[in-house]
Design a protein with these regions (language model features):
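A short, amphipathic beta-strand motif
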Residues: 10, 229, 612-617, 689-698
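Residues that define the transmembrane beta-barrel architecture of outer-membrane proteins
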Residues: 115, 134-140, 168-172, 223, ...
């Protein structure tokens, strides 16, 4: 390498740590070019500088900008530079390495990604025919975006329609955002949702800046909920947040679990609506974010939002909201915030504690609001949140909490309701709410879960309540589950309790085995049903699935149905048809994506918030290890969805899908995208024929072991092995081989027959005209 400054990848103890400019200078004493290494860089990489000072390796007053000779400084340390990869390899004995925080990635590696446009779609259609009464349901969800210069321009829209309702297309929101890596934050402008950690999240038009916890290490990041329920028939499950449909899917009878919901905002309860095939609708709510407010010592999280309230048909007062969370110690967090608008003010103060009995937080919010009639209401709301995993019993309490509000308390949304409705909807305001979620592992005997949600309201009799309990386990190769769910309105007629049991038995030992299953369901309304069937995959790659079932219901009589699912490289398609004595049900769904980038248009499967575009130039059908259904198109491009922002993502090519006539120099690529980025991985490939020549000299003697083979342009093709064979890749269909060894040389003309693609390599015998060594 020549002296100068190079932008290099720095590997610390074999792990990619950061990317930055490093200066290389000529060492006059050794005559070699060496990198300039300073103490500050070693500390950034994770070297324990304090330990070096304690052991007398460096002076206690050493300056961070001091240049050091690493290998002379630390015994056992190594320093190597690989110029072909621009990679600087630094190795330091573990005794002088600080304990690394799991999940931390240096910001210098964060990739803003490509300039590109995409749209991600999910289309659902269902039809129910009950005693000749036909009803349809249609849904199309779109998430579109354009990335340029680190900006993320986004639109979320949904089109819904059905029998008896007008088809509507609604744009949930349009916004633009950009990360602020130096602040571990992001800035957004447009139609947004305010942060809901302290105050309830609201939809607004304006601007917002807030901490992005995705930039933090793993141990400081929370999690989102799993939606569970029980469907009595082939039902449609619709999930809404802040009044907008954010998820819709079809589920078969029995217990269901949805874990891949993509929320619109940072908070706001989820409303789950189960639309049964016979028209029965059940609805309940579930907390989206219900973790104690805590952070580590010295950590600071914040949010600041300004704009105008934005819900259809309601007033749009301007407001400003700010919140802060600060870790006083590893066991004590303080937080608070304020919200001010015309005729409304709210202030919050609270604390979080990490203790031996779990993590909990407690806060109080005070509100003052003026209604349409000029009256001023003031009230308080107290909230307690709790989370704990008991290692001894492997019991987890997650998203558990209790809130109590006085009669005069108003959230910002409730204040807007008071301005919208003259009678001020006092009977609809929540008085208290209890949420509890427990997960219990039973080891080899399975696992259990239980959840409870209960709310009471001012000036309204009764309570709304929903609770669920489930158990799942395995017996030999079979798996089974039991579940019970209850929903109850505040004095309404829609209360119901359901019980379901299921059993699944594999008809083989492989992962692709067909499975025999049975499901029984009973409800408080007196209906009961039994269903059994078989399901599995129809192809080697497990991308084409099927299910066939038959059953009997007390209400609907005998039933039967069939389902098909197909994961293609460009979409996910599902279809189901079920028929009983009085009902016919059909549902179809398709999801996929379109990405427009500088090299063309690439179709793919449904995307996550952040995704990757891979390129294997001019190689179609190349796959990745993480998914059997992802394949490159005819240009060599494919979309890999759901990559993690601010984390290492290794995307490995499935080399068995490349074919015999393609080679890649590297089959793995490491990506670290920023949130919302479209990052690219390019795998350099070479295409050509793979041929083995069985060589002999004119005399019939073998070619000596180690002879070097070149083509007519002098390019080295390979070395002859000890059996006089030469394996080469990427040669022309005809040409001349030149072989040289210590005592002679020879030339051989070859003419290859048409390629045989079913073979790992082709084999030809070849005579070489020998000439004596000069």
């Amino acid at each position: 390498v020549q002296p100068g400054t190079y932008n290099v990848d720095i590997y610390f103890n074999q792990s990619l740590s950061k990317r930055q400019d490093i200066s290389f200078i000529l060492d006059s004493s050794s005559g070699k070019v060496k990198p300039i290494i300073r103490l500050a860089l070693l500390e950034e990489l994770g070297v324990d500088i304090q330990r070096l000072k304690k052991d007398g390796v460096i002076p206690t007053n050493a300056n961070p900008s001091q240049i050091v000779d690493l290998m002379a400084l630390i015994k056992g340390a190594t320093l190597e530079f690989e110029v072909t990869r621009l990679a600087l390899e630094i190795s330091v004995p573990q005794i002088y390495v600080k304990r690394q925080v799991h999940g931390y990635v240096d910001p210098s590696l964060w990739d803003q990604g490509l300039t590109a446009f995409y749209t991600d779609y999910q289309a659902n259609f269902s039809r129910n025919d009950s005693n000749g009464n036909r009803s349809d349901y249609r849904y199309l969800g779109l998430r579109s975006g354009f990335n340029i210069a680190g900006w993320r321009l986004r639109n979320e829209s949904a089109w819904t329609g059905g029998t008896g309702s007008k088809s509507t297309f609604r744009s949930n929101r349009n916004y633009a955002e950009h990360d602020l890596s130096s602040l571990k934050s992001k800035f957004a402008i447009g139609e947004l949702y305010s942060q809901g950690e302290i105050f309830d999240s609201v939809r607004f038009r304006g601007a917002q800046i807030n901490s992005d916890i995705g930039m933090l290490p793993d141990n400081e990041i929370g999690y989102a909920p799993v939606v569970r329920g029980i469907a009595e028939t082939n039902a449609t499950v619709e999930v809404r947040q802040n009044g907008y449909v954010i998820y819709s899917t079809s589920v078969p009878p029995g217990a269901f679990e949805i874990a891949d919901i993509y929320p619109s905002g940072s908070s706001g309860d989820l409303t789950i609506k189960i639309i049964e095939a016979d028209g029965l609708v059940r609805e309940y709510s579930q907390a989206y974010s219900y973790l104690p407010v805590m952070t580590r010592q010295g950590n600071f999280r914040y949010s600041l939002a300004a704009g105008e309230y934005a819900y259809d048909g309601q007033p749009s007062p301007r407001f400003i909201q700010g919140t802060v969370v600060y870790g006083l110690s590893n066991n004590l967090t303080t937080y608070g915030g304020g919200l001010t608008a015309q005729d409304y003010k709210a202030a919050n103060v609270g604390f979080g504690v990490n203790s031996g009995i779990g993590g909990f937080s407690f806060d109080v919010t005070n509100s003052q609001s003026k209604g349409l009639q000029g009256n001023t209401d003031e009230g308080q709301s107290a909230r307690f949140l709790y989370s704990k995993t008991f290692n001894a019993t492997d019991t987890s309490f997650t998203m558990s909490g209790y809130r109590y509000s006085t009669a005069g308390y108003r959230t910002f949304s409730q204040h807007i309701d008071d301005l919208t409705y003259f009678n001020e909807q006092s009977s609809g305001r929540q008085k208290s709410r209890l949420d509890m979620n427990i997960n219990q592992s039973l080891g080899q005997r399975g696992s259990m879960y239980a959840s409870l949600g209960e709310s009471s309201y001012w000036n309204r009799q009764g309570r709304t309540r929903n609770w669920q309990f489930g158990y799942s386990g395995t017996l030999a190769y079979a798996s089974y589950s039991l579940a019970i769910a209850h929903t109850e309105g505040s004095g309404g007629p829609n209360s119901d309790t359901q019980f379901t049991a299921s059993l699944s038995i594999p008809l083989g030992r492989s992962d692709r085995s067909h499975r025999l299953y049975a499901n029984a369901l009973a409800s408080q309304h007196g209906d009961s049903s039994v269903q059994s069937g078989v399901s599995g995959f129809l192809n080697e790659g497990s991308t084409l699935s099927y299910s066939v079932q038959t059953g009997h219901s007390k209400q609907s009589g005998n039933s039967s149905g069939i389902g098909l699912g197909w994961d293609t490289p460009t979409s996910r398609i599902n279809g189901n048809y079920n028929q009983s004595r009085d009902n016919k049900h059909m549902d179809l769904s398709a999801g996929g994506s379109v990405v427009v980038h500088q090299d063309g248009i690439t179709f793919g499967q449904p995307l996550g918030e952040t995704f990757a575009l891979i390129e294997v130039p001019d190689v179609s059908g190349a796959g990745v290890d993480s998914s059997a259904s992802i394949r490159t198109d005819r240009k060599g491009y494919a979309v890999v969805p759901y990559v993690q922002p601010y984390r290492y993502n290794w995307i490995n090519l499935d080399t068995t899908t490349l074919g015999n006539n393609t080679e890649v120099s590297e089959s793995s690529a490491m990506l670290v995208p920023t949130r919302g980025a479209i990052v690219k991985a390019r795998y350099a490939s070479v295409q050509g024929r793979r041929v083995q020549f069985d060589l002999k000299q004119d005399s019939g003697q073998p070619i000596p072991f180690g002879a070097q083979a070149r083509d007519s342009q002098g390019k080295v093709l390979g070395i002859v092995d000890n059996l006089s064979r030469l394996l080469v890749f990427g040669i022309h269909d005809q040409g001349v081989l030149e072989l040289n060894w210590s005592s002679g040389s020879c030339k051989a003309e070859y003419h290859l027959t048409p390629v045989k693609r079913d073979r790992a390599y082709e084999r030809f015998e070849l005579r070489c005209r020998t000439s004596s060594a000069q």
